[in-house]
């Protein structure tokens, strides 16, 4: 739930759960109305909801955890590519197996824990050649445990899930990926675009022939998080301008949180809004300790507080 504004109703899975804990504020935003326009694909694991925003593209959404992470299964005639594997709370490999039987490679938009939780389940995982990537591939427990705090979960966790042992499990990097690499899925080519900024290893994926751009955490509808120690604001600005230049050839922009589809024009507006933030032309409001939110032209950015705030 990468958005501080809370509105609608979340339906909990049992009256007992309702009695045990209050409904988290972010949960009241659900279900998001944008999903009504998308085709939903049934899968057996109820932790996930799967939607089809474009032909042979499946948005694998985790609505029951506050990150509302979205991974994408992109299917070609011979192979498939999974862009992000989510929180590692549900069984994402089981979901992908229900959607395709083609050989599958995993790529991550970046290696924050909410995007790599299911990596360990897959045999072939490519990663960017950065120390940040290698360090995160060792796994971690502390960050994962924070993600299942009571106010971070809407409803119940999956049957068989053990909160006490939950961690981001280590995974093996099968091969390194670089800017400009292409993945031939058979009748569909996916291009890797390095978009550092949010993290050093952030990437976007371009399906040029079909006009699809998968942006990870470089863009998604909601407050964009740029407050981590690994964030580089100059690199982020350069990356979003690079993506904005692609907008004329796009049909859809597909981000990694909240809602899976946005119009391509959002990229130019995003770049313009961020330029205003850097130029001191955005409204600043305090947020969590050490952080502020800048708001301008319908966008909001969570960033480290400037000196003196």
Language-model-detected regions and their locations in the chain:
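Metallo-beta-lactamase
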Residues: 34-47, 51-55, 80-82, 87-88, 128-193, 199, ...
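Conserved beta-strand hairpin/beta-sheet module of binuclear metal-dependent hydrolase folds
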Residues: 44-98, 205-220
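Accessory terminal helices/loops
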Residues: 17-41, 238-309
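Positively charged n-region of N-terminal signal peptides that target proteins for export
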Residues: 1-4
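Alpha-helical assembly-interface signal, strongest on the long, hydrophobic N-terminal helix that forms
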Residues: 8-11
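Active-site HxH/HxHxD metal-binding segment of metal-dependent hydrolases
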Residues: 89-184, 221, 265, 270-283
């Amino acid at each position: 739930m990468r958005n501080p504004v809370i509105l609608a109703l979340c339906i909990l899975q049992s009256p007992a759960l309702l009695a045990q804990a209050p409904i988290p504020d972010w949960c009241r935003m659900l279900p998001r109305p944008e999903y009504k326009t998308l085709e939903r694909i049934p899968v057996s694991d109820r932790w996930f909801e799967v939607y089809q925003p474009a032909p042979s593209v499946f948005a694998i959404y985790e609505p029951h955890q506050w990150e509302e992470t979205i991974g994408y299964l992109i299917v070609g005639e011979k192979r498939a590519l999974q862009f992000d594997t989510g929180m590692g709370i549900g069984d994402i490999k089981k979901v992908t197996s229900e959607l395709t039987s083609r050989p599958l490679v995993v790529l991550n938009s970046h290696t924050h824990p909410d995007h790599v939780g299911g990596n360990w389940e897959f045999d072939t995982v490519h990663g960017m050649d950065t120390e940040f990537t290698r360090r995160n591939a060792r796994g971690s427990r502390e960050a994962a445990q924070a993600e299942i705090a009571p106010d971070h979960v809407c409803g119940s966790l999956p049957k068989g899930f053990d909160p006490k042992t939950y961690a981001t499990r280590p995974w093996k990097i099968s091969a390194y990926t670089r800017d400009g690499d292409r993945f031939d899925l058979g009748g569909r080519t996916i291009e890797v675009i390095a978009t550092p900024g949010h993290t050093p290893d952030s990437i976007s994926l371009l399906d040029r022939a079909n006009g699809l751009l998968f942006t990870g955490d470089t863009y998604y509808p909601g407050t964009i998080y740029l407050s981590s120690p690994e964030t580089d604001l100059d690199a982020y600005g350069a990356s979003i301008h690079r993506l904005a230049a692609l907008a004329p050839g796009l049909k859809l922009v597909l981000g990694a949180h909240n809602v899976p589809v946005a119009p391509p024009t959002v990229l130019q507006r995003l770049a313009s809004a961020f330029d205003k933030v850097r130029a001191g032309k955005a409204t600043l409001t305090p947020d969590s300790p050490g952080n502020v939110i800048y708001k301008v032209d319908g966008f909001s950015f969570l960033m480290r507080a400037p000196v003196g705030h």
